[in-house]
Amino acid sequence: MILDEPLKLTQAKSLIREILKSGEVIYSKPHAEERLRKWNLTTVDCVNVLRGGAVAEGEYENGSWRYKVYTPRICVVVRFESDNMLQIVTAWRET
């Protein structure tokens, strides 16, 4: 677990990119998987949002810090499991 959360926006974005490059991305089961189906999103859509989206301030919810990463069309919520693993908690299409 990352001990110095909440991360600054630049730190969160850098860590997300580093994890995408050399870490592991996991999906909350069953919630994230259900949301991807509901909103007709793919894992590639989520990775693309994580690569190029903006990061919002962290929010503390259900015992962990969560970060919204968003584009005008899609929002993905992540939490950091460790310095080299993030979990996609949920995702949706902006309407």
Predicted regions and their residues:
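Ribonuclease/tRNase effector modules and their secretory precursors
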Residues: 1-95
